Regions:
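Short acidic-aromatic active-site loops that bind/stabilize oxyanions
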Residues: 71-87, 164
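Beta-sheet entry/capping signal
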Residues: 1-3, 107-112, 173, 239-241, ...
Length: 326
């Protein structure tokens, strides 16, 4: 078993100059054109259906054409550095695969590749930290590309890491195992979550999940095995998927998604902040059905609250910092 966790492309955004040079100028068209072209390619590849519309540009992000040429040059470089980081990750994963092939282990190795969250919009809207001076850039500890490029990275979704809307929580997940997964050459559209990884690996290895470990009782195993997907069969999920992150939350039950910003307050969930979407028809969360599907929203909100108590989301701290004693 090998767990390979890259920090890239998390900030600070830093990369080798020879990698950056490959991408200089490639983003000079700006985020507006990039979002549109990526969306059109996603539709062409069948990743999304045309009924799932491209979300509007984030309201805090300016139009690319409104920037002065010098600022456009800076922003092109910020994205080039980010792209260079991913380029280096990609090549090093390629090295690992090459070794597996040389050792005749590639076909029998199950590879799981995923991201932990959506694009990061932390910091200034147009990025932060020095980007032109190479020495200073590589000494920065928090420089990044900003919400403007993160908005493009999340295409076609809206919002980012920290939020539980699709732009923050829906990420790529690739499983590769020539000896165990039948190639279907088509998109598999059943939802999975990170909690499904352990049940999947346990089943593949033929290992039962223990009730105790070193005399301590273990929490029940959450999630389901994804092995039905190996032959393109539907997943047998009988319970909704729940999440809470930094007071934001979601619940997905079939095609219905309950989601909200700042829902999980210290006093309990704020039902007024819940939004409701039918992901089957509206994957980009543009049509909030909270008013027209009020009863469904209430039932899902009650289910989320019950889960939050069971999984100890509550009680939450008040948020008031205690004064330190000297």
């Amino acid at each position: 078993f090998l767990y390979l966790a890259y920090t890239a492309p998390h900030w600070p955004h830093q990369a080798h100059e020879e990698d950056i040079d490959k991408y200089r100028g490639k983003y000079s068209m700006g985020w507006d054109q990039l979002r549109q072209s990526r969306y059109e390619r996603q539709i062409k590849l069948g990743l999304f259906e045309e009924k799932h519309r491209l979300s509007p540009r984030d309201s805090k992000v300016p139009a690319w054409t409104s920037l002065k040429p010098e600022k456009q040059k800076e922003m092109d470089l910020r994205m080039a550095v980010y792209a260079a980081m991913i380029d280096r990750v990609d090549r090093n994963i390629g090295k690992l695969i090459s070794v597996l092939k040389k050792q005749d282990l590639f076909d029998s190795t199950l590879i799981l590749f995923m991201s932990d969250n959506g694009a990061c919009a932390e910091g200034e809207t147009l990025g932060r930290g020095n980007i032109f001076d190479v020495k200073k850039r590589n000494l920065e500890i928090n420089n990044n590309y900003g919400a403007a490029w993160a908005n493009a990275s999340s295409t076609p979704f809206r919002l980012y890491k920290h939020y539980t809307h699709e732009g923050g929580s829906a990420t790529p997940f690739i499983m590769h195992w020539p000896k165990g997964i039948k190639s279907q050459r088509k998109w598999y559209r059943h939802s999975a979550q990170v909690l499904d990884v352990v049940p999947t690996l346990l089943e593949v290895c033929g290992v039962a999940y223990p009730e105790t470990y070193q005399g301590h009782e273990l929490y029940p195993l959450r999630g389901i095995s994804l092995t039905p997907s190996f032959s393109a069969k539907p997943l047998t999920r009988t319970k909704p998927m729940f999440s809470e992150h930094e007071n934001n939350a979601f619940m997905i039950d079939g095609s219905w998604k309950l989601v909200g910003k700042g829902v999980a307050t210290p006093k309990g969930p704020d039902i007024k902040k819940w939004e409701l979407y039918n992901l089957k028809d509206d994957r980009t969360e543009l049509k909030n059905l909270a008013q027209t599907e009020n009863q469904r929203l209430k039932e899902m909100a009650d289910s989320w609250h019950a889960w939050s108590l069971e999984d100890k989301v509550y009680p939450k701290p008040s948020g008031k910092k205690k004064k330190r004693k000297n």
